[in-house]
């Protein structure tokens, strides 16, 4: 992850039926969705000179895993089930996950370079 200037936000995405316990201590923004629903995770940035944005996910007990990236000269980039949208005017990007599955339960990070 060399060259990453800032880590903007992280979000715990969980399927409603997956988590039955209570979390103690760290309170992360949480998005709970039903299996099969679409999810949207938003991220804001402040450095208008940023030209490269990356989304990672980190499953419990594992290291961060690259999901998708986008360059500042693009508005949209699509993967297999994920799409990233970049709005440079308002310095905002979003990660859309189609047909959410149990394997999507993770902490999500957005970063700039």
Swiss-Prot record:
Keyword terms: Adaptive immunity, Cell membrane, Disulfide bond, Glycoprotein, Immunity, Immunoglobulin domain, Membrane, Receptor, Signal, T cell receptor
SUPFAM superfamilies (UniProt xref): Immunoglobulin (SSF48726)
Disulfide bonds: 43-110
Glycan attachment positions: 87
Keyword Nucleus appears in the UniProt entry: no
GO cellular component term of the entry, any: T cell receptor complex
Residues spanning the signal sequence: 1-21
SMART domains cross-referenced by the UniProt entry: IGv
Subcellular location field: Cell membrane
GO biological process: adaptive immune response; response to bacterium
Domain Ig-like: 22-113
Pfam families listed in its UniProt record: V-set
Assembly mode: Alpha-beta TR is a heterodimer composed of an alpha and beta chain; disulfide-linked. The alpha-beta TR is associated with the transmembrane signaling CD3 coreceptor proteins to form the TR-CD3 (TcR or TCR). The assembly of alpha-beta TR heterodimers with CD3 occurs in the endoplasmic reticulum where a single alpha-beta TR heterodimer associates with one CD3D-CD3E heterodimer, one CD3G-CD3E heterodimer and one CD247 homodimer forming a stable octameric structure. CD3D-CD3E and CD3G-CD3E heterodimers preferentially associate with TR alpha and TR beta chains, respectively.
Physiological role: V region of the variable domain of T cell receptor (TR) alpha chain that participates in the antigen recognition. Alpha-beta T cell receptors are antigen specific receptors which are essential to the immune response and are present on the cell surface of T lymphocytes. Recognize peptide-major histocompatibility (MH) (pMH) complexes that are displayed by antigen presenting cells (APC), a prerequisite for efficient T cell adaptive immunity against pathogens.
Protein name: T cell receptor alpha variable 13-2
Organism: Homo sapiens
């Amino acid at each position: 992850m060399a060259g990453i200037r800032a880590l903007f936000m992280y979000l715990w995405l969980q399927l409603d039926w997956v988590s039955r316990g209570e979390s103690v201590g760290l309170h992360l923004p949480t998005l709970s969705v039903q299996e099969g629903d679409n999810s949207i995770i938003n991220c804001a940035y402040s450095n208008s000179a940023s030209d490269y944005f990356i989304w990672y996910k980190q499953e419990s007990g594992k290291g961060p895993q690259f999901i998708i990236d986008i360059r500042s000269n693009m508005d949209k980039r699509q993967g297999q089930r994920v799409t990233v949208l970049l709005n440079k005017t308002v310095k905002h990007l979003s990660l859309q996950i189609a047909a959410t599955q149990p394997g999507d339960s993770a902490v999500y990070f957005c970063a700039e370079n």
